[in-house]
C-alpha cells in the first residue's frame, strides 16, 4: 500500500510505492545471496563507491568504500550462512529506503541485527540501488 507522508514531505511523496519497493527488495535479495555465497565482487558493487559510505560491524568500524572493500576481501569465506528471522524494507519516495533484518547463524546463541540505508543512483546494476550505510550487531538473549 502506498502511504503519503504526514506533514510537508521533503522528498517525493510516497512510502513503499509498489514498483520502488519491488526494486529495493530485488537489490536486497541480490545482496543477501552475495553475502552468504561470498560473492565479493557483487557485494562491492552494491555499496556506494564513496568516502562517505559507512559500515559498522560487530567488531569493526569501516569508513569509506575502500575500507569496506578491503574488509570484504580479507574476511573468512566460511560460516556465512544465516537464517533471516524478520525483514522490514521501507522505501521513501523513488530513491531512498532502509532494510532491517534479524538473523541467526548456526552455533551462534545470539540474534544478529543488520540495518542498511539504500539510495538509488543513476546506474544499471541492481536498478541503481546502493548501500550507503550499514550496521551489524549481535543481541544477547
Q: Residue ranges of each PLM-predicted region?
A:
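Short, low-complexity N-terminal intrinsically disordered segments enriched in polar/charged residues
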Residues: 1-50
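Short beta-strand edge/turn micro-motifs at domain boundaries
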Residues: 2-4, 98, 111-141
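Hydrophobic alpha-helical segments typical of transmembrane helices
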Residues: 27, 39-42, 72, 85, ...
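Hydrophobic pocket/interface hotspot
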Residues: 31, 43-44, 52, 64, ...
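A short gly/proline-enriched turn/hairpin at secondary-structure junctions
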Residues: 46, 52-62, 73-78
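Short beta-strand segments enriched in hydrophobic/aromatic residues
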Residues: 47-48, 103-105, 135-138
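Short, mixed charged/polar active-site loops
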Residues: 60-61, 109-113
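Surface-exposed, charged secondary-structure patches
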Residues: 66-111
